[in-house]
């Protein structure tokens, strides 16, 4: 766990327990991280950067109860920031690719739970072959729905429906595994 992750997580936990000073400090520290994250992705738009920082901090505040304190805070906050950035680009119809190495400094260094990975492998294995192939092609390999559908011998629309059903079945299986 990084020093920033440790500090942010401790501040947010104290904030959730009612320590408003710690909560404010945690949001301020997160704001600095978010500003740097958005600046790397938003060249020439400092006003947009500030808007995104504020939107993300507001979303973190409003959705703080959804954060599982047993998990990484920075990974959760990064997901919120990423969705806010995607929403921003959609509003402006901007498409950009983000190199993975840009995310390394923000991501937590916690290793994934091997039990979860094993359960996910089991859940994938329980799917019918076509659904398993679609999940692998679209979500793991990065093929488009049209490409994955062509590989499976079905239309893009049928691939979309089959993928949706597969992901729904996986989510249900994982929920049942959590107890």
Curated annotation (Swiss-Prot):
DNA-binding region, residue range(s): 145-164
Sigma-70 factor domain-4: annotated segments: 123-170
GO molecular function, one term: DNA binding
Main subcellular localisation: cytoplasm
Region (Sigma-70 factor domain-2) residue spans: 33-93
Subcellular location: Cytoplasm
Induction record: Slightly induced by dichromate, partially dependent in itself for expression, does not depend on sigT or sigE. Probably part of the sigF-nrsF operon.
Domain of life: Bacteria
Cited function: Sigma factors are initiation factors that promote the attachment of RNA polymerase to specific initiation sites and are then released. Extracytoplasmic function (ECF) sigma factors are held in an inactive form by a cognate anti-sigma factor (NrsF in this case) until they are released. Up-regulates expression of 4 operons (sigF-nrsF, CCNA_02834, CCNA_03001 to CCNA_02999 and CCNA_03363 to CCNA_03366) in response to potassium dichromate (K(2)Cr(2)O(7)) or cadmium chloride (CdCl(2)). Overexpression of sigF leads to higher expression of its regulon.
Protein name, as recorded: ECF RNA polymerase sigma factor SigF
Lineage: Bacteria, Pseudomonadati, Pseudomonadota, Alphaproteobacteria, Caulobacterales
């Amino acid at each position: 766990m990084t020093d920033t992750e440790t500090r942010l997580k401790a501040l947010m936990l104290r904030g959730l327990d009612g320590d408003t000073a710690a909560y404010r400090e945690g949001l301020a520290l997160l704001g600095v991280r978010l500003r740097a994250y958005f600046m790397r992705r938003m060249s020439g738009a400092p006003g947009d950067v500030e808007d995104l920082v504020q939107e993300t901090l507001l979303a973190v505040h409003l959705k703080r109860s959804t954060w599982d304190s047993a998990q990484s805070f920075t990974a959760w906050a990064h997901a919120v920031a990423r969705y806010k950035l995607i929403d921003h680009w959609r509003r402006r119809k901007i498409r950009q690719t983000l190199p993975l190495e840009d995310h390394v400094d923000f991501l937590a260094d916690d290793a994934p739970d091997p039990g979860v990975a094993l359960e996910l492998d089991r859940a994938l294995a329980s799917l019918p072959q076509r659904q398993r192939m679609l999940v692998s092609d679209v979500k793991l390999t990065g093929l488009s729905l049209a490409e994955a559908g062509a590989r499976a011998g079905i239309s893009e629309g049928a691939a979309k429906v089959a993928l949706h059903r597969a992901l729904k079945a996986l989510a249900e299986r994982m929920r049942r595994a959590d107890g």
